[in-house]
UniProtKB/Swiss-Prot annotation:
GO terms for molecular function: serine-type endopeptidase activity. Keywords: Cleavage on pair of basic residues, Disulfide bond, Glycoprotein, Hydrolase, Protease, Serine protease, Signal, Zymogen. Pfam families: P_proprotein (PF01483), Peptidase_S8 (PF00082), S8_pro-domain (PF16470). It comes from Hydra vulgaris (Hydra). The lineage of its organism: Eukaryota, Metazoa, Cnidaria, Hydrozoa, Hydroidolina. It comes from the Eukaryota. Probably involved in the processing of hormone and other protein precursors at sites comprised of pairs of basic amino acid residues. Its EC number is 3.4.21.-. Residues 1-29 form the signal peptide. This is PC3-like endoprotease variant A. Glycans are attached at N62, N190. SUPFAM superfamilies: Galactose-binding domain-like, Protease propeptides/inhibitors, Subtilisin-like. Belongs to the peptidase S8 family. Furin subfamily. Transmembrane segments: none annotated.
Amino acid sequence: MNYRGIYRRRYVFVLLLLVAVVNISYGWTVLKNKDYKRRYLSPSGVEKVRKHLSRKYVASRNNTQTFKKHYFSNTWAVHIDPPDNDVADRIAKKHGFTNIGKIGNIEGHYHFKHEEIGERELEKARHKTALLNLEDEVKFAEQQKILERVKRDGIPNDPYFKDMWYLLNTGQASGPAGVDMNVVPVWKKNITGRGIVISVLDDGLDWTHPDLEANYDQTASIVLNDNDNDPMPRDSDADNCHGTRCAGEAAAIANNGICGTGVAYNAKIGGVRMLDGQATDALEASALGFRGDHIDIYINCWGPKDDGKTFGKPGPMAAKALRLGAEQGRNRLGSIFVWATGNGGLTDDDCNCDGYTTSIFTISIGCIGDHGLSAYYTEKCSSTLAVTFNGASHKEGRENKMVTTDLYHQCTEEFKGTSASAPLAAGIIALTLEANPLLTWRDVQALIVHTAQITSPVDEGWKRNGAGFHFNHKFGFGRLDANAMVNAAQSWKNLPAQRKCTAASGFDHQDIPRGDSLFINIPTVACESSSAQIAKVEHVVLTVSFVHRRRGDVSIDLISPKDTKSQMLSPRKYDDSDEGLDEWSFMTVYNWGENPKGIWRLKITDNPNQDDVMNLFNGDNTDDVESLEERVIDTQTKQNKAEWEKMRKENPYFDVPYPTGVRKDKVLGSTEINDNSFDTPHTETFKIIRNHIPEVNLQNNDNMNTLNFDPVTGRKKNSINKKIINSRKRNFLTFRNFLKKSKKVQVQQEETGTQRVQVNAGYENPRISCESGYTTCSGVLINYKLTFYGTGE
């Protein structure tokens, strides 16, 4: 056989094949390069690429795009009319779906799931949506977007500690004795939450925990992520402990020698597993509307990111579920939705940017530490109703421990954030509902307003509204007092039916001056001479739309006819968005009890260079009032402990009497400030000062600046400080002019130079067109609407 000829032919064949491949590759490269040059190297192509990259970067900085890997779920919300489960099953089967069931308590709305549609099969999903919408019985079908939701316990953990100082504070923590929730007197009345059902909407509930099992309620539990009835968390992931920890604070069993004690330790507890997976509007609506005929209180310790730049609110179905829960839940008395305000204080976040906490149907709960002072990550806003305790201190560093149940049948003292505060509030509300089961959802809120106690009394943020109620944007109406709330509930008369009055609206575009304020007077008769007339307001909702060069520079204040000021939006240094807001509803509870008739004032301010303002007026040498109070409290605590130790040596049976804490026994009248206004054993220093305070009227908050003495703190105002402040203001104005010049140069460089991968907060948005025709505005107010909720005469 001629092997040499065979090898030669094979060699020639391989050589020809390689030549062909090289030629084809070269030709393809030429065509590709020509196409590349035609598409991308032309001036218009380069500009398109630049704008595309710029948009992507701005979107990532402003958090306006959701993570795209899981943007759509494989579930649909389908509205079928007339509502019929058999029709829903037929339509679902016809198009390859599975009918999971009704969406919460919304009539005619069904949850469909398609197992064969992947997360990136958008065309196939659109085709399925179109087919569903062609059905005669289908009013609408919508594929569900996946919403990003985060748990609110992201605070560093601490070593183990067994004493629950927030339930009975005898001085075992670093703070003073008596600063607690005053829950022991309620337990002594045999009020322990019996007959009340609480459900935790979270990442699951380890109901087999020996400190929870006897109180577990299967009817109040479900798994919405997997359509199951067992809410056991996926304990392979240690982060899925959040719901179990919330449950333990509210309803852990007492007197069983295990872990700690829940506030309402005889209440029933359930869990809705909804955070262990993809969140959608339909899923949230299902959770918020789940078994409203059986569940009394829903604990919610989740929401949009606390990053200081996000605006997030319930979707249309979740918002409707909240409303229907308030209208129809608990046999039409109204479901109680307790919500944690968030932990975004370190990023200057504002809880009014969270549409869940600003809903009139939710009870927004903030947090304080063992000294009764605000936590270092506290968010301030006008929708906060009250505060309870958690392990945080006023300054970052020292932490106290919170005892609760944990995964693997363990006990932990490492629960932090407002997630540790909201379950305590839910427990107190459970005690209140046992004392009076006929309370409506509005009655519960009103009881909080009437009975919450002043905490951190020297804080200068305490004001009094036109109806005589104290409030503070850090603390709401104050710290929840279980005993005071239960006592008031036992003789409480239900509020009259709620009324809604759309008081005023404006649709004329108005400029927001650069570095200045837009003032709008809003006269209203509060729907006088109609069935919607309101004489006592409860919730005030301000809905606004505006565009602005930098949303984080905008602050919004609303002043009532009684001169009560609510900051509806505060500046946020990390919010670089230039998109403004579209029909965003801010809410305040701080006009509670006022007659809304009169002239309301709306103030919208552009606050450029807010960081420089804070540095000038709050330098390192400036002590905040709460830090000073903390040092005074610590001194008094040490003295008290020394006296107690001495008495124990003289009398071995001596025990510390139950302390009164920082409480007010009633809502003070406008001239009732006296030595007993803030009854606390460790504030003698402040009482000495108050001995010299003349009687003052707190009703007009704007006139308080003219007094020589601050009526809330009892401290003499220092005229030297005014000189210092005026000097700092002059320095600031000079510095701001310098920044304006620097900013102008920087803008010119950005416009004429190469695009940098950086978003500067000071850049002007070329899309904003000032109504005045000049370029002196920072933004434009598009419209506003003022809505009152309350009662008539």
